């Protein structure tokens, strides 16, 4: 078992993203990075534009869904790809969860960015968020 980073596994016509972190915030950051590694080589994305997000969800799963879907919306509407992610905090009370996060990236430039696959949407398929032995594991499927 690893505790940090992300990985992809084959999952029919979709991509299963599995992300890890020592904190829930780090696992969400790695989940976002995992999604954008499906799209391009994130190490080549310059942090030219910052996007801030303050998002609420009814539970952790809904929060993860809305967080990733928010990033995908910027890609769809403005052509942005992201390579750096910072989740400042995730809080849950009995009624809802919230996240405060930032992502840095730039417009996709085919002369500098590798075109891999278009991520169409976030899904709830195979979604799991759990903590085990001091390591958070976040798993979900994106539609490509």
Curated annotation (Swiss-Prot):
InterPro entries registered for this protein in UniProt: Archease (IPR002804), Archease_arc (IPR022952), Archease_dom (IPR023572), Archease_dom_sf (IPR036820)
GO molecular function terms attached to this record: calcium ion binding
Annotated family: Belongs to the archease family.
UniProt name for this protein: Protein archease
GO biological process: tRNA splicing, via endonucleolytic cleavage and ligation
Residues annotated for Ca(2+) binding in this entry: 14, 143-144
Function of the protein: Activates the tRNA-splicing ligase complex by facilitating the enzymatic turnover of catalytic subunit RtcB. Acts by promoting the guanylylation of RtcB, a key intermediate step in tRNA ligation. Can also alter the NTP specificity of RtcB such that ATP, dGTP or ITP is used efficiently.
tRNA processing listed as a keyword: yes
Keyword tRNA processing (UniProt): yes
Pfam families given in the database record: Archease (PF01951)
Keywords, alphabetical: Calcium, Metal-binding, tRNA processing
